[in-house]
């Protein structure tokens, strides 16, 4: 796969992360027993922000709520696909400047695709890494994929899988699906393990991911 195709693949994943409504708060966890042992599984709770109208989000941003800023940036981004709105960038920047992990992840996306800013994959990676250091699930996924592709940083499969697994354990369905696929296919990346593949597919399927549901059908 050439660098252009790798970039498009990463962007597609990032777009799915935002457009798929994954910009939310993850917290709480329970223990899940499987044939291979006990896995820590985070319950995913959709933040109140995701159910708010644009006007409600604007009211929250006026109070300095950095999470609401990130969600509003995402909301406007989704509502005007194909058209660049400076407010999307301004909100993401303000949220990130207030040390909001979701805001950093959103700003990283904008630098990845060159939305209202010159495309800068290194800056995008740095933002993802900062957010990943605070265990932001989508950012952990983005960092993992960056290491796996080797496009922005030196390719490091071990690091990539580590971040991907952290994201999956945090409850991020995209990472759970990816791990399921890696275990199902096997190869140089990891040893084939159908049972583990089914476990990860099941976790992603439980959160409504169509691709995982298809693999289990």
Residue ranges of each PLM-predicted region?
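N-terminal leader/linker segments that initiate helical-solenoid repeat arrays
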Residues: 23-74
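Hydrophobic face of amphipathic alpha-helices that form TPR/SEL1-like repeat modules
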Residues: 71-79, 106-113, 117, 127, ...
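Short helix-capping/linker turns of helical repeat alpha-solenoids
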Residues: 63-65, 78-80, 98-100, 113-115, ...
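N-terminal Sec-pathway targeting helices
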Residues: 1-17
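Short coil/turn connectors between adjacent alpha-helices in alpha-solenoid helical repeat scaffolds
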Residues: 41-45, 76-85, 115-121, 149-157, ...
């Amino acid at each position: 796969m050439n660098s252009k195709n790798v970039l498009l693949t990463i962007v597609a994943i990032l777009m799915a992360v935002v457009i798929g409504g994954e910009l939310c708060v993850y917290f709480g966890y329970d223990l899940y027993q499987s044939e291979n042992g006990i896995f820590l599984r985070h319950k995913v709770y959709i933040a109140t922000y995701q159910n708010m109208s644009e006007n409600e989000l604007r009211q929250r941003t006026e109070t300095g709520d950095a999470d609401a800023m990130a969600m509003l940036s995402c909301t406007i981004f989704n509502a005007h696909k194909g058209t660049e709105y400076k407010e999307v960038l301004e909100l993401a920047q303000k949220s990130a400047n207030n040390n909001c992990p979701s805001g950093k992840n959103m700003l990283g996306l904008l630098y990845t695709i060159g939305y209202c800013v010159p495309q800068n994959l290194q800056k995008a990676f740095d933002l993802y890494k900062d957010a990943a250091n605070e265990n932001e699930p989508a950012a952990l996924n983005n960092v993992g994929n960056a290491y796996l592709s080797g496009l922005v940083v030196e390719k490091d499969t071990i690091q990539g899988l580590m971040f991907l697994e952290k994201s999956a354990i945090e409850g991020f369905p995209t990472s759970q699906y990816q791990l399921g696929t890696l275990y199902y296919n096997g190869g140089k990346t990891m040893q084939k393990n159908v049972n583990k593949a089914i476990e990860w597919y099941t976790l992603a399927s439980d959160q409504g991911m169509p691709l995982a549901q298809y693999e289990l059908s």
